[in-house]
Amino acid sequence: MESLASLYKNHIATLQERTRDALARFKLDALLIHSGELFNVFLDDHPYPFKVNPQFKAWVPVTQVPNCWLLVDGVNKPKLWFYLPVDYWHNVEPLPNSFWTEDVEVIALPKADGIGSLLPAARGNIGYIGPVPERALQLGIEASNINPKGVIDYLHYYRSFKTEYELACMREAQKMAVNGHRAAEEAFRSGMSEFDINIAYLTATGHRDTDVPYSNIVALNEHAAVLHYTKLDHQAPEEMRSFLLDAGAEYNGYAADLTRTWSAKSDNDYAQLVKDVNDEQLALIATMKAGVSYVDYHIQFHQRIAKLLRKHQIITDMSEEAMVENDLTGPFMPHGIGHPLGLQVHDVAGFMQDDSGTHLAAPARYPYLRCTRILQPGMVLTIEPGIYFIESLLAPWREGQFSKHFNWQKIEALKPFGGIRIEDNVVIHENNVENMTRDLKLA
């Protein structure tokens, strides 16, 4: 494999080209990209955990340092002012010296408010991208050039197409997350609580709970019916029935986002349903290719859900086509088939049809779908189907013409297991689809 340094060099060349095009289109001279700042909790002197501006970490793998600035014009070497205070209260990151620093001019910034004297004097044609608009105004940036929508839409659109450097980072994030999932399954099998399973996961991935790309979903039994369950019970349940883990990792600012579901016993209907969802997920991925709308794959999986509802006699005396047509599959899979993935877990531009930001909304029947793009080489997406037993979604179906088709006794028997979700991260290539997750043998 090419070294990360050579991949990064090509990555920077790609970002420079995109920057040149964006600046020419919107008649700007340069972009000033701010890593961000620490913000204190209300009425406190303690800051929230720092989360870097994703447009900043697209350029440099600096994810933990506030008050940094990048100046890019698409022609000259990117200039990074790296915050390096004299501070005996807090840890100070040293000036970077790594695989990427040859391609960026790195300058120490000893005082956060010292950036103003270091920037070009003429700033009327510089665009600011960052989370603190008032800081940009203080620096003399024109209000109309603060987070200009056209520029951001343009950059977001092309972020969908990952460079080889980005894919290399995402494969490393996969490795970390896979290690975590294996450790978490072992913790589940040994009878640990959600809280302790989460600690096992973080230990295996080398993350703190503030460093993972999203809050880990560690859900035992009926908690698996809560799509974004993040409570973490300290006490293990008396009976272990099921375990849903939706947890990722981050490498150089790039995310992995994986989900697995396990049954405590291998000889019940729930365990067979887990296996069947897994098989259907893999079967769907095997059909994926460039040139097809992501929406089509979402709709296709509802047809696969119907097949499983029929096989397991959860819905009876109704054709699979009628189930989908009348949305009887809807309460069982109330989320999209997945989403774009990259610098952010729910990565940007899922609805953008072109680099002008043309928006194509999700279908009215599936408003929670996060992507309506035509799949193209370089895109990275999650494929994460599920089947859940959520009373608030099932309740409206307990009355009316379709109620008789629901096997309510079977549903009640499955509700204590919560639900099932299986999630892999895939890369669209010209002639194939790479499953980064399964390539690491995560069952």
From Swiss-Prot:
| Sites where the protein binds Mn(2+) 2 | D246, D257, E423
* EC id: 3.4.13.9
According to UniProt, the reaction catalysed is: Xaa-L-Pro dipeptide + H2O = an L-alpha-amino acid + L-proline
State the Gene3D superfamilies in the record: Creatinase/methionine aminopeptidase superfamily, Creatinase/prolidase N-terminal domain
User: What top-level branch of life does the organism fall under?
Assistant: Bacteria
* Cofactor annotation remark: Binds 2 manganese ions per subunit.
Q: Which cofactor does it need?
A: Mn(2+)
Q: What EC class is this?
A: hydrolase
GO CC annotations on file: cytosol
Cited InterPro entries:
Creatin/AminoP/Spt16_N (IPR029149), Creatinase/aminopeptidase-like (IPR036005), PepQ_N (IPR048819), Pept_M24 (IPR000994), Peptidase_M24B_aminopep-P_CS (IPR001131), X-Pro_dipept-like (IPR052433), X_Pro_dipept (IPR022846)
The record ties this protein, via PANTHER family, to: XAA-PRO AMINOPEPTIDASE 3 (PTHR43226), XAA-PRO DIPEPTIDASE (PTHR43226:SF8)
Q: What protein name does the entry list?
A: Xaa-Pro dipeptidase
